[in-house]
From Swiss-Prot:
Keywords associated with the record: Ribonucleoprotein, Ribosomal protein
GO molecular function: structural constituent of ribosome
Statement: the UniProt record of this protein carries the keyword Ribonucleoprotein: yes
InterPro entries hit by this protein: Ribosomal_protein_uL29 (IPR050063), Ribosomal_uL29 (IPR001854), Ribosomal_uL29_CS (IPR018254), Ribosomal_uL29_sf (IPR036049)
Signal peptide limits: none
Family per record: Belongs to the universal ribosomal protein uL29 family.
The protein's name in its UniProt record: Large ribosomal subunit protein uL29
Annotated GO biological process: translation
Gene name tied to this protein: rpmC
One Pfam short name: Ribosomal_L29
GO CC term, one of those recorded: cytosolic large ribosomal subunit
Top-level taxon: Bacteria
Length: 68
């Protein structure tokens, strides 16, 4: 997912996105454990997408608290 798409979402949307990505990552890990995953690069990209979403989420949360 692109950072521009993530930055357009609000805090609740980002939290939902992080949960969705974590579920997807868990599913990929289970596929890898049972040797059903063909493209292991998806694990890396999903993990990095989670990190991007969490980073932007923290930025937005800190911006909200500093604005108050």
């Amino acid at each position: 997912m692109k950072t521009t798409e993530l930055r357009q979402k609000d805090v609740a949307g980002l939290q939902a996105e992080v949960k969705e990505l974590q579920k997807a990552h868990f599913g990929l890990r289970m596929q890898k454990a049972t040797q059903q995953l063909n493209n292991t690069a998806t694990l890396r990209s999903t993990r990095r997408d989670i990190a991007r979403a969490k980073t932007i989420l923290v930025e937005k949360q800190s911006a909200e608290t500093s604005a108050k």
